[in-house]
Amino acid sequence: MATVADGFRYAERVVSGDIVAGELVRLACQRFFHDLEHGPERGVYFDEGRAQHVLDFYNFVPHVKGHLTGKPIELMDWHTFILINLFGFVVPLIDEITFESILDDDGDPMFVRRFRTAYDEVARKNAKSTLSSGIGLYMTGADGEGGSEVYSAATTRDQARIVFDDAKRMIKLAPKTLGRLFGSNKLNIHQERTGSKFEPVASDANNLDGLNIHCGIV
């Protein structure tokens, strides 16, 4: 089972040189530690609970290809590092008119994810589509967003279906866990309880206007 500590350890090994990595990866790891130390000075915080929540979700996400088909995914440390960055760092939710922090019913500040966009470039056969499919499912039904709209987009609909079809197969292979959270058909994955959906779309489609996107995977 992946833990936040695995992501920390990966970043430490990259910074120390134990893991050979490109410049952008090294900079990302250095930024990670800098933000942990200095982020609160500018309103950036790391929420370990949020980070661990998405990692725990992957305990129910199965492999969909190869000899490991049906078995739970074991996230590699670099997968974990990506996920805790995206889901762990938060900033206060600010009112766009008053520029003041928005408070919850208990009078505490509400927080939202710091990062709204991420770019991930890896070599083939490194489970990029699998990781993306898991993120798509998480954002559809485990992120606490009612009416969540998640889209897998590409130049053509067939390309967009790669991540989507993997996500559908994950649900089929995990009927006692993911199968209880989601329903699926040819057009979408959905969660009736929250009115959320996950669909593939082509970038040249005529129906892209007006989408209220909670998560887009391109």
Which ranges hold each PLM region?
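Phosphate/NTP-binding elements of NTP-utilizing enzymes
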Residues: 2-218
